[in-house]
Amino acid sequence: MKRKLTICLLIALIFYNGNAKAAERGSLEELNDLSDTVFQMTRQAKYEEALQVLEYFEKTLKSAEKKQQDPMLTGAQIRQITLGYNDMVRSLKQADTSDTQKLRAAAQFRMLMDAVDNRSDPLWGSLEKPIMEAFTELKRDVQKNGSTSFHEKWNEFISLYDLIYPSLTIDVSEDQLETVGKHIDVIEQEEFQQMTESTKLERLSLLQHDLKNVFDRVEEDDADPSLLWVIITTGSIIITALTYVGYRKYKAEKNKLKKRDYPK
């Protein structure tokens, strides 16, 4: 009798855990879908509608957190989602924010939520090719001693890296991101231009190698055509307008609070 009771309890526990996991998966999937809706609304310049979806997104996130006995998101994930959400709302509400900046914020938020929901083949992984191909041109400019062209290509690279950086904080270890960040800091220093050609190429190769390691952790997947459209159509504009402001901000927030969990 005791054995039968134990078996029944185990089955009930397994069934409960299965339902909890399914509910958690459903909530994350819904949040991911909502971020895509925000992206599509922003792409069509339907900003009021996008804000309404974001309002529902916030309510859904809070509701999902309250319903789960075990938090479906870590404190770090909640913090990154909150940062992305606030950026998205702010960009849509500010009158002086250009359509390009709004669309970029939407693409960034879209990839962030996909990274939270999709751990095997996140959307940010599909941007490996344009990001890694930048090194060929950067090295070519170093060899030709074309400083102006190098800076343009570098800002282009940083602009793409900025686009996926929030997503990387979800999927990539802090140590890996810090290593990549240190390489970027070195190249951005004025002293970099005073280095010999061989040293510059070595620094670029180190960054290239560690970034390749970051991308190697995800499965290859086809790029989202909508996101590629954003990159292609806004690329030349965002280089000068945005450079790497977002990257700096997320990096500063990460370093500032890396040992403190987001309060619940």
UniProtKB/Swiss-Prot annotation:
**According to its UniProt record, where is this protein located?**
Membrane
At the top level of its lineage, which domain of life is listed? Bacteria
Q: What membrane topology does the annotation report for this chain?
A: Single-pass membrane protein
UniProt keyword Iron present? no
Pfam families (UniProt xref):
Spore_YpjB
Q: Which UniProt keywords apply?
A: Membrane, Signal, Transmembrane, Transmembrane helix
**InterPro entries assigned:** Spore_YpjB (IPR014231)
Q: Which residues cross the membrane?
A: 227-247
Q: Which residues form the signal peptide?
A: 1-22
Any one of the GO CC terms: membrane
Q: What is this protein called?
A: Uncharacterized protein YpjB
Q: Which organism is it from?
A: Bacillus subtilis (strain 168)
Its ancestry begins with: Bacteria, Bacillati, Bacillota, Bacilli, Bacillales
